[in-house]
Design a protein with these regions (language model features):
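Sec/SRP-type N-terminal targeting helices
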Residues: 94-98, 111, 140-170, 192, ...
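A ubiquitous short alpha-helical element
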Residues: 63-68, 118-123, 186-191, 262-264, ...
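Periplasmic alpha-helical coiled-coil/stalk elements that build and connect Gram-negative outer-membrane
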Residues: 30, 145, 161, 165-282, ...
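A small-residue-enriched
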Residues: 29-53, 84-141, 244-253, 280-365, ...
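Terminal intrinsically disordered/low-complexity segments used for targeting and assembly
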Residues: 2-88, 237-282, 452-461
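Short segments within alpha-helical structural elements
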Residues: 228-255, 365, 369-370, 399-457
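Residue-level recognition of short, well-ordered coil/turn positions
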Residues: 91, 213, 288, 312, ...
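Soluble, cytosolic/nucleoplasmic coiled-coil alpha-helices used as oligomeric scaffolds and tethers
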Residues: 106, 113, 120, 162, ...
Length: 461
């Protein structure tokens, strides 16, 4: 018994034979790719971040990544080292890579021909027998397969862009966490110096009171400085521990990881800040999130076309049939069977209206997203510029002034014009100004990271 073959084509005026051949060709090429769509993510990561990213689907790939991570951990980490470790080792990122595998499976499935259905009906009342055999094909599904396959391809591209955004977000988070961790470690060192100076002042005050050379009020002042310094040191150590733990988590390192080394200091401020890039060009050419929304918009256009194409007919099954009626052994009667849904109560109007509303909604959201992207870049640049000015002023004005004051008071102390407590207070103030400078440098590098992320399309900044 010959069976007609089925496939899917875009609804058009092309002859049925051409449509069938198109579907056969589509079904024949619906196979899995070697890279699972990951090569484009890897190449764009290399272009935008100059970093390696690897989808570890085998034990060999996992071992290669582990070896690269171990090599980086052998030396004091720089910011870009931490980013590279995160891109290789973060398991949440690996889970997002698996979305590519899920999406590719959907893509391949969308190109497969629908399975035929076989129906057998047997009834007998001696000496009569009634046997009906039917092999049917969902012709509508076959005719819309090219539409569905094209939609699946766009969804696959959408997933690739979403995965790339996840890569950029992780890189940005890790870079900021690194700057925070280094600044927190530096802050602990300076707070320890402040606490040591305050402790010396409190001890000296206690001895002078015991010798009858000082009053209890002045001693209480020194003791309060010492207590406050101890509290700030505890807070700094907590901040250091939390910042370090966050960096460990983003890099995908376990809590029992041997102590890794961070750089001793934050990078120095650059000589000058970068100019604001052309926002229109940056938004249209660099923003991955806008590219993703554009892909989603194109997908809705395709969905709208598919809805229009299948508006009136939702079920159309065609297939050969043969029937045997009469005494057992009677010849079969051959023919065909068509199952057609009659759009009597539902002509597809609500589905079409819904698809049109979804498309209109997507257009408005895409337009607003472009406006938001421009605003985000301007805000990020303003924060970047202000952070640079603040850090530069701390470095060039505040810290030198505090150092000069301390030097002058040392001369006055040598001339017996000020007390040792004045020197200790100056030391505390000078160290505090250096700590403020460290925090301002940290804020600058974080602002720089947020600006870079805004230009690339990380809308979470």
């Amino acid at each position: 018994m010959s069976v007609p073959t089925t496939s899917t084509i875009v609804v058009s005026r092309a002859p049925l034979a051409a449509a069938i051949w198109a579907v056969l060709a589509l079904g024949g090429c619906a196979t899995f790719s070697k890279d699972g769509g990951f090569d484009s993510v890897s190449q764009e990561t290399r272009t935008r971040l100059d970093k390696d990213v690897r989808w570890t689907r085998t034990a060999q790939e996992r071992a290669k990544s582990d070896g690269q991570v171990a090599e980086l951990l052998r030396r004091p980490l720089a910011a870009e080292d931490a980013v590279q470790i995160a891109l290789l080792n973060n398991r949440s990122l690996q889970a997002s890579f698996d979305e590519l595998g899920i999406s590719e499976a959907d893509l391949v499935q969308s190109g497969r021909l629908p399975n035929p259905r076989f129906t057998l009906r047997h009834a007998s009342a001696a000496p009569q027998v009634d046997i009906e055999e039917t092999l049917s094909f969902n012709v509508l599904s076959m005719l819309t397969t090219p539409y569905a396959h094209e939609i699946a391809k766009r969804r696959f591209t959408e997933v690739q862009n979403a995965v790339l955004i996840a890569v950029m977000q992780l890189a940005n988070e890790t870079r900021q966490a690194f700057f925070s961790a280094v600044a927190a470690r530096e802050s602990v060192r300076y707070q320890e110096q402040v606490q040591a100076a305050a402790e010396a002042g409190a001890e000296l005050a206690r001895r002078m009171v015991a010798a009858g050379n000082w009053n209890l009020l002045d001693q209480a002042h020194e003791q309060s400085f010492y207590t406050a310094a101890g509290q700030r040191l505890t807070e700094a150590r907590l901040t250091d521990a939390l910042a370090r733990e966050k960096l460990l988590r983003l890099m995908g390192l376990p809590g029992d990881q041997p102590d890794f080394q961070l750089g001793e200091r934050l990078p120095e401020l650059p000589p000058r800040i970068e100019d604001l890039p052309d926002i229109e060009q940056a938004v249209l050419q660099s923003r991955i999130d806008l590219r993703l929304k554009r892909t989603q918009l194109d997908e809705l256009v395709r969905n709208l076309g598919l809805t229009k194409a299948s508006r009136f007919v939702n079920v159309l099954d065609v297939g050969p049939t043969r029937v045997q009626q009469g005494p057992e052994g009677a010849p079969y009667e051959r023919g065909y069977e068509i199952t057609l849904e009659i759009p009597l109560f539902d002509a597809g109007g609500p589905r079409l209206r819904r698809a049109e509303a979804l498309y209109s909604q997507a257009v408005e959201r895409f337009t607003q997203a472009a406006i938001d992207a421009r605003s985000q870049i301007r805000r990020s640049y303003a924060a970047y510029r202000a952070a640079f000015d603040i850090a530069k002023r701390q470095r060039d004005e505040v810290v030198p002034v505090r150092k000069a004051v301390a030097a002058q008071n040392l001369l006055r102390y040598n001339a017996s014009l000020v007390s040792v407590f004045d020197l200790l207070a100056d030391a505390r103030d000078q160290i505090a100004s250096i700590d403020d400078y460290i925090q301002s440098v940290r804020d600058f590098w974080i602002a720089k990271s947020e600006l870079d992320a805004a230009l690339l399309g990380d809308s979470s900044t």
